[in-house]
């Protein structure tokens, strides 16, 4: 007899709603009347044979042995009185399947959440395997998120204990889910912990890319591909997947078990290395912190109470707008009006100077041991850092003014004559070019497979980043400053554009048919007029505002982010991302063309009058200030606990919070 909402089990659990149903059981949302909380209740179907009852009870016993926070525990065990069906209760998970963390977007926040979840699930599997248990059926539906975004493994109905594996096969039937099944399991062979790691790799592949590694018209087609076909590179399906993440996924999906990571603990370590690679390359090497251009860097100075100059070096030329300091590993780079790109060690020691035939004011891009930089003579170069050799050179008809943007094995570069060029990253050959309606000064952004480019005649263009095909465009006003984009809930984002005339627009985006689209007929969520020219890009952070932030009285009621925008006249404002309401404002002593940079809850600013500041991003309070004789137009870099600033007179300085021993040496 089927159960219905309102049914009371064991005099304690009132069934509220059916959450899901499988071949052996139903899962309900239920109210625990004794403890006054909602739980998930799993009850076996009443028509199943005794063998399935044994499997159901084995799942309960298995869960009872596991105590890792990444495994859903058993809260209670009972029996439905009429048919004698066993049931057990578990915590109710409200975050949905792990696929809600994807597909991956090119911004630090979503990537960090993915890596945190991947490492947590890997450690949970290690705990499971250390008890001699193999799950055998990991799928996105069996890895659910809690309300903090951490994954919990559940549904151990096909669990294989090392001494009982032979009892869990049926003649002619392969148990498991084909889309996530290891090759040895697909062939009906023996399984072990590495089979689960393969399945977790397939699950995380789907999270990262939006689809599993293999799809087909039938289960047999999918199983065949798992056994015999090479795994498609995840970067081909979703170019936002970082190289470090792609490498781990492909390693997990090796056909031979002995070529995969050998334990969940080893896998968790690989995710930690991928996170380190993300922090050292994603945010520093590309202008404004990556392809989303949020202006937020993950590892800048967290303490600024005693920030002092660490070193300074003279550059062979002035440094002016729209230049920016970028970095990778132990190198920082900035271009000059003298026609050179200068690379310096983070210690202040010179590394290399690369020449151009004209000014190098567009921000460079450092990636994978190479540097990409454009000049005013219309040349764009790729140089190998170790040898200094030029890999290729592309000649355009006008100067390059925006930062080269690496995406999907290509390079997107805007030129002054209104063309957005897509070049092969490997060869420099032109893949496509798009002609906007006017000159381009802003750098492109990439989100959800779309290149977003503003021009100086007032239009925001959205293109298919692979083909250059126009998707849509919207009129926003003349734009010199590169916009910034902050992903929201999966499949959504907010794009913030500051126009030259002083209007700041927040535009809602969403994924439609795999590409970025305007969110609704009126996608402009709010507009704020700074009543000044704007040359600096806005900076965005997802930092939520606590009640004691000292910002606007109702700031705590509007979580979701902060926008920092600077007018050319020197007035800087903090706005709520949700609605554009004022949080704080501060007037600086000098014009602002350098874009603000956010890191560790601080916003770093520099003026043409030589004033450097660190403000609390929540309330605008000054945490550090310094004045130099020369002004700044280039966007600084906050990385590895250090602030790097290139001054208009051609001086590059590094600032860092002083260590006590260093300070005493300075004073002595």
Swiss-Prot record:
Task: Name the catalysed reactions.
Answer: L-seryl-[protein] + ATP = O-phospho-L-seryl-[protein] + ADP + H(+); L-threonyl-[protein] + ATP = O-phospho-L-threonyl-[protein] + ADP + H(+)
Tell me the keywords, alphabetical order.
ATP-binding, Kinase, Nucleotide-binding, Phosphoprotein, Serine/threonine-protein kinase, Stress response, Transferase
Q: Describe how expression is induced or repressed.
A: Expression is induced in response to DNA damage.
Annotated phenotype, changing residue 162 to A: Almost no change in activity
Query: Which InterPro entries does the record cross-reference, listed alphabetically?
Result: Kinase-like_dom_sf, PQQ_b-propeller_rpt, PQQ_rpt_dom, Prot_kinase_dom, Protein_kinase_ATP_BS, Quinoprotein_ADH-like_sf, Tyr_kinase_AS, WD40/YVTN_repeat-like_dom_sf
Instruction: Look up the domain of life of the source.
Output: Bacteria
The name this protein goes by in its record: DNA damage-responsive serine/threonine-protein kinase RqkA
Origin organism of this chain?
Deinococcus radiodurans (strain ATCC 13939 / DSM 20539 / JCM 16871 / CCUG 27074 / LMG 4051 / NBRC 15346 / NCIMB 9279 / VKM B-1422 / R1)
Q: Which gene encodes it?
A: rqkA
């Amino acid at each position: 007899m089927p159960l219905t909402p309102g049914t009371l089990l064991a005099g304690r659990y009132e069934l509220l709603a059916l959450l899901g149903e499988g071949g052996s059981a139903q899962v309900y949302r239920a109210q625990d009347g004794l403890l006054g909380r909602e739980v998930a209740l799993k009850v076996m179907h009443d028509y199943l044979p005794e063998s399935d009852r044994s499997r159901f009870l084995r799942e309960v016993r298995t869960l009872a042995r596991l105590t890792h926070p990444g495994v859903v525990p058993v809260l209670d065990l009972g029996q439905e009185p009429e048919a004698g069906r066993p049931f057990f209760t578990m915590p109710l998970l409200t975050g949905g399947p792990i696929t809600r963390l994807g597909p991956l977007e090119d911004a630090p926040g979503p990537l960090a959440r993915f890596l945190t979840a991947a490492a947590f699930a890997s450690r949970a599997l290690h705990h499971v395997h250390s008890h001699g248990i193999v799950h055998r059926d990991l799928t996105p539906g069996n890895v659910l998120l809690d309300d903090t975004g951490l994954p919990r493994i559940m549904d151990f109905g096909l669990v294989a204990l090392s001494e009982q594996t032979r009892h869990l096969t049926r003649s002619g039937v392969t148990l498991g889910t084909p889309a996530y099944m290891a090759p040895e399991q697909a062939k009906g062979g023996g399984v072990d912990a590495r089979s689960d790691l393969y399945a977790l790799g397939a699950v995380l592949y789907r999270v990262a890319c939006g689809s599993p590694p293999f799809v087909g018209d039938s289960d047999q087609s999918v199983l065949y591909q798992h056994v015999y076909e090479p795994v498609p590179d995840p970067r081909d399906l979703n170019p936002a997947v970082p190289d470090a993440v792609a490498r781990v996924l492909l390693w997990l999906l090796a056909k031979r078990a002995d070529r995969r990571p050998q334990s969940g603990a080893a896998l968790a370590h690989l995710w930690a290395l991928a996170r380190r690679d993300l922090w050292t390359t994603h945010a520093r090497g590309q202008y404004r912190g990556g392809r989303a251009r949020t202006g937020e860097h993950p590892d800048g100075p967290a303490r600024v109470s005693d920030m002092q100059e660490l070193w300074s070096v003279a550059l062979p030329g002035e440094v002016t707008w729209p230049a920016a300091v970028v970095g990778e590993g132990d190198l920082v780079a900035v271009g000059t009006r003298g026609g050179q790109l200068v690379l310096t060690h983070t210690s202040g020691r010179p590394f290399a100077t690369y020449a151009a035939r004209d000014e190098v004011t567009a921000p460079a891009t450092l990636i994978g041991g190479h540097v990409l930089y454009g000049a005013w003579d219309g040349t764009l170069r790729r140089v190998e850092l170790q040898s200094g050799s030029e890999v290729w050179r592309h000649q355009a008809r006008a100067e390059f003014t925006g930062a080269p943007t690496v995406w999907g094995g290509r390079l997107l570069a805007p030129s002054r004559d209104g063309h957005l060029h897509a070049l092969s990253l490997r060869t420099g050959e032109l893949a496509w070019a798009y002609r906007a309606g006017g000159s381009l000064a802003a750098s492109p952004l990439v989100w959800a497979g779309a290149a977003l480019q503003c021009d100086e005649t007032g239009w925001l263009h959205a293109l298919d980043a692979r083909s250059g095909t126009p998707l849509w465009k919207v009129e926003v006003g003349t734009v010199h400053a590169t916009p910034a984009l902050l992903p929201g809930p999966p499949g959504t984002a907010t794009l913030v554009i500051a126009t030259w005339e002083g209007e700041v627009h927040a535009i809602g985006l969403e994924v439609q048919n795999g590409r970025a689209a305007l969110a609704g007929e009126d996608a402009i969520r709010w507009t704020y007029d700074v009543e000044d020219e704007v040359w600096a890009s806005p900076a965005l952070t997802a930092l939520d505002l606590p009640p004691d932030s000292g910002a606007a009285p109702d700031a705590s009621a509007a979580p979701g982010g902060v926008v920092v925008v600077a007018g050319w006249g020197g007035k800087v404002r903090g706005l709520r991302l949700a609605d554009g309401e004022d949080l704080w404002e501060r007037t600086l002593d000098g014009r602002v063309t350098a874009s603000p940079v956010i890191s560790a809850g601080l916003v770093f600013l520099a003026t043409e009058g030589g004033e450097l500041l660190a403000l609390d991003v929540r309330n605008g309070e000054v945490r550090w200030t310094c004045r130099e004789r020369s002004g700044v137009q280039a966007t600084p870099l906050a990385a590895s606990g250090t602030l790097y600033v290139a001054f208009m007179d051609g001086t590059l300085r590094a600032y860092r919070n002083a260590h006590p021993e260093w300070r005493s040496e300075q004073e002595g």
